[in-house]
Amino acid sequence: EKYGKQYASEIMKKSKRVYRELVEQADDIGDDNPMAYNELFALSFVAPYVASDKNIPPETVQEMMRRSLYHIKWYFAKTDLNTAKGKAENKKSVVKYAKWYTPEKETQYPTSFKVDFVGQPHEGACYYRITCCPICTYADKLGVRELMPLFCELDEVMITLQHGVLHREHTIADGGEYCDYY
């Protein structure tokens, strides 16, 4: 809506090719990686930014991503983080990944997400930390680091759609040693 139909169409056409290239050139984090969708989703928004030669402002890319999240809000709304069931679902997905990322997997996929549960602020809280983020690492390699803090801000949107509140003090994108989710 901001750039006209012809320009948007050209960028989206280029984006498809760029997206495939980005996925092919990304570090292998495992085909069966339970968190791989996070990187694939982010790359679908990095692609038009790269395809436009960074002529689309990062804030516009963030808005595109935010709108897509609201478009599938029904999916996130199925989980209510205010209920025991919702908290259990959230924890289950994080624990599933933590169990998947064994020392053998870490050797095989050293640049994948690293998750831990160090420093839980409140007993019973949904809390974890990401201490290595392949999305940030790849953004640095691609020269699009400016997108990362904006993408991280969208974690709050996802948590809000799950009827929760994200309390965050650190992100790797902002120079922190980890991203905290609480």
Feature roles, as predicted:
Residues 1-52:
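N-terminal, charged low-complexity regulatory/assembly segments
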Residues 6, 57-59, 145, 165:
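Short coil/loop linkers at secondary-structure junctions
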Residues 12, 63-65, 151, 171:
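Proline- and acidic/polar-enriched loop/turn elements at helix boundaries
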Residues 35-39, 146-153:
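Short, conserved micro-motifs enriched in small and acidic residues
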Residues 37-141:
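Amphipathic interaction/junction segments at domain boundaries or subunit interfaces
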Residues 124-129, 139, 145-151, 169-174:
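Non-catalytic recognition/regulatory regions in large multidomain proteins
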Residues 149-182:
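C-terminal structured interaction module
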